[in-house]
Amino acid sequence: MWIEGNYRRNLMDMHIDDWNPEFLSRLDVDEYVDALKDAGVQAAMVKGRPHTGLAYYPTKIGRMHAGLKGFDFFGTMVQKCHENGIAVIAYFTQIFDNWAYETHPEWRLVTEEGKGMREYRGMKNFKTGRYGIVCPNNAGYRQYVKDCLTEMNTMYDFEGMFLDMTFFPEVCYCPSCRRKYMDETGRELPRKIDWQDEEWLAYVYQRDQWIAEYAGFATSCVKAVKPQVTVEHQFSRITGSWVDGSTEDIMKAVDYAGGDYYGGFLQQTFINKYYKNVSPNLPFVYHTSRCDPELVYHTTTKTEEELLLHVITALVHNGAFLLVDAINPDGSIVPEVYHGLMKRIYDRTRQYEPYVNGNLYYDAAIWFASHAKYDPNETDIEVREKSFEPSYYMEAPVAAASVLREKNVPFEVIGTGNIWEEKAKVMILSHVARIREEEMDAIEDYLARGGNLYISGPIGNERLQKLLGLKVTGRTKHNFTYMSPTEEGAELFEGFSHVAPLTIDRYQVEAEIVDDMGLTVLATRTLPYTMTDTYEFAAIHSNPPGIYTESPCAVLKKVGESRIIWTAAPIEMSRPYMSRQVFYRMIDLLRGEAAFTSNAPKFVEVLGWNKDGTDYYAVINEQEESPVASMYDIWIDVKGKAGQKVCLLPDNREVETETVEEDTLRIHLPKLEVFHMLRLGGE
């Protein structure tokens, strides 16, 4: 497959309208391709049909962009890129298509208020008046998609396609969705959110399947003409809410995972791990903008350190990096970005490409459960009141990742499909709202193979409750609570006590013990004297503990050779350092012996992997803001490797080592600026 070894990619983002004759009047394909070649770009994503719906090639379907005056920009780019040894990924927009929206009102997505998306102004979530959104369930729109994809693949030869915007940006109540749901279920579309209602849950799952099925349809349109063309669907909305309908099932319709992100380096390392594990083939591709921090800031460029961090973080996870640049409306580019900035970065990172694509060493695996993209507390409300960024779904597992990075616990992020073969010492279910039966089958299999679980917040399946010996009875009325350690839990809850319990600034799940065999209560629930929003209070500035209960809020359960820890709320989301330490101790207890250890500071990530029998380590300084401060005196301890030579790549410069604790190799790193890559047993 052409993607193998193809790590350096580029997209010139150009969703440009054509009402002004100035728009795209200064396009210069030769200048652009020359810039890409000089920078060392291996693949160019080229716009074929953007969000405007105005084709950048002579089309018989819809309309061509007037500013091109008949010039085949797309076809010329394909030709020039191939002449210069650059692969081409054809860009095609889906669902976001202004031409389709305006020309075919019957195709439009219809909100719960009965409006099309361009009827809104100045609102978030694409309700700005700019984006024309159509419904993927509409048969007429699907025929249009098929015709467009057939046309592009018939007219041109390219290596891959990026099918963008594979998600619902809103809940759709158009006639097509209403009819489809009625045909499939015999019911009208629901308009009230209730996460305790099986019909509502079934509807949300149905929408997930609609998007996955649509993705499969679009992919089949490409493969029917050019089976060898790779397909990448937009997968960044996996981090969004249930509204998107974007789940891991989309991976059935792609050749590799990819999507654009703008959330910083902790988010990137989390997503890169997830993509690496769910992608059908590698490398996956991580997109982010040249603009700082995102495309809205059209003229502001990220620092060289920041872009270097993006590229190397993707690379060590065996991911390609795609720079999303922003073309000026007149079609001109900023060539210095390529002849200077990106050339320097790619010249440096390409030296490390031969050493990646190994098997990561890790102790913990965070399960990112894409079928549970909701906050169970956001219930019994109208659909129009929904949140587009639900608490917990993304926040909780990323918070867990933050603590693991801080404490130098090597970790992975996995999808549902990975659980069946998961070998992590501990799997983390960080506030997973719901676990499907087939997912529970995989979890039970993992436990039967000796794996351990950490679960926080909801116990999302009755079978899991039974394994724990607990029965969930509800949720605290208090939204500010405490965990009081028992004698058995005192070591894990070090720093907290009955008098000074661990603060939880949120609700707790309530559960009662129904089977105490092999169960140890680590902490019990404590509540403030009053609610947080009442006239009465104990202390005017705070909510001190006052109501002590015997109700369990942290337990350790032994199940065969495996152990499960459950906490009634995600301690990993706590801000105080002492509280995060409790989460770390729980993970450390469950994982046992570490794959490797380090004293690296909290924002420095150490990754280790084995490729073809050789061990490698990368140390990445993932500070979120430039300038990146240099770090000193970092060491890595690797058990069983004493006496091995360690070289700093790419120049094979030997680094200082020593033997500690008999068979442990301690690697002393030189000054860390942005990153280091090391090889054990150097040439």
Task: Report the location of each language-model feature.
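Carbohydrate-binding surfaces of carbohydrate-active enzymes
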Residues: 4-6, 35, 77-80, 88-92, ...
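Aromatic-lined carbohydrate-binding/catalytic grooves of carbohydrate-active enzymes
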Residues: 37-73, 96-114, 118-119, 170-181, ...
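Aromatic- and glycine-enriched glycan-recognition loops and surfaces
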Residues: 20-39, 60-84, 143, 213-214, ...
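Catalytic domains of carbohydrate-active enzymes, especially glycoside hydrolases
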Residues: 27-52, 311, 402-403, 407-409
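Boundary/entry segment of secreted carbohydrate-active catalytic domains
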Residues: 1-24
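Active-site neighborhood of glycoside hydrolase catalytic domains
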Residues: 140-250
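Short, acidic/polar
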Residues: 21-38, 141-152, 241-248, 303-311
